[in-house]
Amino acid sequence: MSGSYPFIDIAALDSVREGFARGDAQLVLAHDLSTVLWVNGPGAKLFGYNRVEDLIEGQLDLPVATRRQIAAFSSENTSAPSAVAVRLGGGLRSELTHLHVSNIKLPDGVAALLVATQMPDNSAEAAISGLGDDSTHIALVDAVGKVVAASPRFALLDISASTLEDLIVEAGDATDRIVKRRIRTGSHSVPGAIARLTDTPALHLLCIVGDAPAQFQTAAEAVPLPDNAEAVLEEILPEQGDAPAQQAQKTHAEQPRPKTFAFDHDAPPARFIWKVGPDGTFSEISPNLAAVVGPNSADIVGRRFSDVANVFGFDTDGSIAALLLERDTWSGKRLLWPVEGTRLRVPVELAALPVYSRDREFLGFRGFGIVRPAEAEADPEEIGLALAGGIPQNRKPRKEPAETARMVGEDDVLALSEEVANDDQPAAVLPKPPLDITPTPGRRDSDKVISLLNSCAQEKVAADQAKFLKEKERATRPEGGLTKTERNAFREIAERLRKQGLANTRAESETPVSETSSIEPVEPTPPVKTRSEPIQPDETALLANLPVPVIIHSGDAIHYVNQALLDITGYESLDDIRSAGGVDVLFNSESDDGETRQSMLLRHADGSEEPVDAHLNAIAWRGGRALMLSLMPVTAADLPAPAELPAANDEEKQALEAHVEELKTILDTATDGVVLIDPEGRIRSMNHSASALFGYERDEAEGKFFSMLFAIESQRAAMDYLHGLSGNGVLSVLNDGREVIGREAKGGFIPLFMTIGKLPHTRGFCAVLRDITQWKRTEEELTNARKEAERASNQKTEFLARISHEIRTPLNAIIGFSELMADEKFGPIGNDRYRDYLRDINRSGNHVLALVNDLLDISKIEAGALDMQFEAVSLNDAIGEAIALMQPQANRERVIIRSSFQSNLPDIVADSRSIKQVALNLLSNAVRFTAPGGQVIVSTSYELNGDVVMRVRDTGIGMSKSEVEQALKPFRQINALERRKAESAKDWRNEGTGLGLPLTKAMVEANRAQFAIDSNPGQGTVVEIVFPPTRVLAD
C-alpha cells in the first residue's frame, strides 16, 4: 500500500478507527479536495475502485456541486462531523449519499478532511476489502487472538496464536494504540504493525509486510498463460529486433516528441474548448485545436478575436464579432482556419454561451468548436506557410483509410452519435465524446462547458444507456430474441473484435516513424496478409451464423451483412441493399405521425417497418476501422401497451373532440404556463401562457428537451425533479414543487415556481410554471425593509448611548453642586427661597438622569444588547427589597403597602437587577396613581401547572382598555384632564416620562416571562407577571 502516510497510522487515529472497524466507507482528502491521502476498501469501492492502491495518492475528480458542498462544511473550524447529502455517480443512475465531513489532524500535524458514510455491509470482511496483495497481508484480530477476517494470503504466514496474544497485550499498553516491530512468521520474522481499533469489544488491525513462504509462492505463480497470450503480445508490442522488451519500452518512453508539426488530412473531426473574456480576448483554448492546425496557428491566448480574425482572414463580414458584443447564446458559425506549414485551411464550426457571475456581471463567453481536417481546402493567401516560418520539408503523414475518416462526424440516418458508441474506441481514431465521465486529475472547469451546451445530447446519452442496461437485465427474451448461449457467443465475438482493434491502434501508435530526406522508388509489391488482420474468415463465419442481424459499415458504405439481416429485411444479397440505397433505405428514425420512438424502425424490402433495438460498436475491419451495428427485434411484450379506449360512435367521438377543445381553451386561458413532456424529457406541447412566458413559438419548442427552458444553474434541479417523479419514489408522493430560474428565448431570466405531475396513460409529465417575479420583488423589498429597520434601531441605540454619555457629565455636576450648596458647608445661603430653588434643581437633575437611563435601557432591550446575568433569583426577596425602598414614599402619600408571599416559593432563572427594577417600577406606579387611604397589595404564588406568578394590585383610579394600550407605548402619557376625581384624590398620571410601563414590559419579556395588565376605571389595576415552568428551579 503506497502513500505518504503508513496505512495503519491513519487507521489508528481516534476519528478514523471506530468507523474503520464498523466497515464505514472512509476517505481522507487534502484541503484541495482532489488529492487522496488515505482510503479504506469500502471507501475505494464507493468511488468506483476495487483496490485501495488505485486511489491512494491519486486525484479524485469530484463533481463541482459535491466539491462546493464539502468545501462549505470543511470551512468550519471544528472537529465535529457535519452531515452533507451529495449525489455520486452520473446521469439517471446517480444516488443521493449522506456523507459526514470532519476536520482531522494527520500524524505529522497536517490538517486534512475525513469523508465517511455508513455502508450496508458492515461485516469484518468488508472492512478490510480492497487490502492485501502478495507482499502485504491484513487481518482483523479480536481480544483473544482469533482472526476474525484476513486477506487471502494471510494464512500462509503461519503466525502462532501466542505471537498474536503478545501483540494484543503490547497494543493495549501502547499510548498511541500502535505497536510496530518484527513479527515471527513460521521460521523467520518480517516487519509488521498492530493497532487497537476498538475497546469494547476489542478489535485489532494487523498489517504484515513480507512475502509468503517460497513453497506457496511457487504454486501461486505457476499459472499457465492463455493459449492466445503470445498472439496478443505480438499484436500489442511492436517488433524491436533482438533488443530486450524492457529496453524497447524504455526507448519508447524516452522518445522525444516531434519538434515539427505535420498536418494529417485524413484525421477525424476534433472538438476543442475555447473561452474569451468580456473584451473579446482569448483566455483559454484546449490543445485539440493545436493538434490539428499546428501549435503556432492555435497560439491565440491573450489576443483579441478581432485581431486574430484580421490576421487569419476570417469573419470578414464581422458577424461573429457582432455576436460577441450581443452577449447571447449562438452556434453554427463557420470559418476557415489556416493550417501551420501548409497552403491549406480547414473549416471550423464555433458555438458559444455567455457566462455571468453571481452578481450578473458579464464574464465573457465559453464555447466549443469542431475542426474538420478532412474538408481542408486551398488557402489563396498561404497564411499557414507564414505561421511555420517558411516552406516545410515534404513529409507525408501516415494515413488511415478514407472510409474511417468519412465515417466519423457524419449525421447518418441511424441517429447514433459518438456518445453512444462503445466506450473502448481509441481516441486517435474516433473523436472524443462531448461529455467525458472518466475521472481526470487536474481537469479544468472549462472542459465541462460542452455538457452545458449539449444538454440535449447528454440526456439522449443517459436515456440510451438506461435502455441498454434494461436490455442487459432482461433474463430471457420472447420468441424471436436471443437465447442465453447465443447472447454469450455474440458478446464474446464483439469483445474479441474490440480487443483486436485496440491492439492494432496501440501497435500503430507505438511504431516509430523514421524520416528520410529522399525516397527511392521501389517496385510495387502485392499486398501481404499480416498477422494483425482484424477479422479472420472463421470470425466472419461466426457472424454469419448468428441469429442476430449484424451490419458492418462506415458512414453510408456497407461492408458486410449477415444472413439474419437478409432474412429479416427480405433482401437477397448485400448488392441488393446497396443498389436500393444503402443505410438510408434500411432505417427510419421517425414514424409516419412524426413522433420520435425510443426504438429504431427497420424498413423491409417491401416497404414495411419493424421496431428494433440497435447497439453500436467500433471494430477493426480489414486494415481499417468500421462500425458494427447489431439489431434486436422488439417484440410486442417490449412495446408499451396502448391505453384501451372503449369503442365510441360518431356522437360520442364528436363530444370527446369538443371536450378536448374546451380543455385546450381552458389551458390557453390560464395565466400559468403549462408544458406537456414525453417520457424521454422532450416537449410535446405548451399553452399560450408558456409560449409567451419563454418567448418560443409552439412549433419551435416542440420536440426539444425540457431542460432548454431553464438557466444553466437550474437545469440539474429541474431534471432531477423530473427523474424523481418517474421513479415512483418519495417525490411522486411528496410533490411540493421547485423554485427554478427560467431562460427566455432572447437570453433573459425569469424566476419560476414549477410543479410537475405524471400523466397516467402516456407515461409523460405535465409541468405547471408560475412567474414569481412579483413575489421575489416583494420578498426583496421586505428584506430590505427589515435591514433598514435594524439599521435604524442600531443607529438609535448608538445615538442614545452617545448622548447619554454627553448628558451624564453636566448632570452629575449640577446635581452634585446643588446638594453641596443646599448643605451650606461653605456658609449660609441666607434665604429660604434659594434653598427651595436648589432642591428643585436637584430634583429636576435626578429626573433627567433617570429619563436618560430609561431611554438607554429600552433601546438596548429593543436591540437585544442589554447585558443580562441569568441566575437563581428569590422572587420574594427581590420584591421585599423593592417594598422597603418604596415604603417611605408610600407613607408620604398615605398609601398602605401590603404583601402576601407564598412560603417555599422556588427560585426563578432571571436577571436579579432587572427583576428588582420591574418591582420598583410597578410599586412606584401603583403608589403614584392611588389616592390617599388606598392600598397596594403585592403577592406571589406557585401554580399547579408549575408557573410562578407575581401580582401587584392597587385601588387607584384605573384605566380603560384604550388607555392601557396607550400607556404601553413609549413616550405616551394618558390625558387625564378629561377625567379627574371630584374629591381630594390627585391624579399623578400627568407626571413622569411615559417610559415606566413600556420599560417594565420589555424587561419582563427579556427575562422570558409573560406580562399582563388588567384595569378598570375607578376600580384599580392588576399587573400580573408569569414565569413559565422552564424558568422555575423546582426541587
From Swiss-Prot:
Q: Which reaction does it catalyse?
A: ATP + protein L-histidine = ADP + protein N-phospho-L-histidine
* Domain spans labelled Histidine kinase: 802-1031
* Pfam families in alphabetical order: HATPase_c, HisKA, PAS, PAS_8
Q: Top-level EC class, please?
A: transferase
A biological process (GO) of this protein is: cell division
Q: Which residue intervals make up region (Important for polar localization)?
A: 1-613
Q: Any one cellular component term from GO for this entry? A: cytoplasm
The UniProt GO MF terms for this protein read: ATP binding; histidine phosphotransfer kinase activity; phosphorelay sensor kinase activity
The alphabetized UniProt keywords are: ATP-binding, Cell cycle, Cell division, Cytoplasm, Kinase, Nucleotide-binding, Phosphoprotein, Transferase
Q: Where in or outside the cell is it found?
A: Cytoplasm
Q: Where is the PAS domain?
A: 659-730
Task: Report residue spans for region: Interaction with DivK.
Answer: 614-1035
Query: Which stretches does the entry tag as region Disordered?
Result: 500-533
Q: Summarize the subunit comment.
A: Interacts with DivK.
The UniProt function text for this chain reads: Functions as a polar differentiation marker. Essential protein that, by localizing in the old pole of dividing cells, controls cell division and maturation, probably through control of DivK phosphorylation status and cellular distribution, which in turn regulates CtrA, a transcriptional regulator of the minB operon. The asymmetrical localization of this protein is probably required for cells to enter a new division cycle.
> What is the protein name stated in its UniProt record?
Cell-division control histidine kinase PdhS
Say which species the protein is native to. Brucella abortus (strain 2308)
Q: Which gene encodes it?
A: pdhS
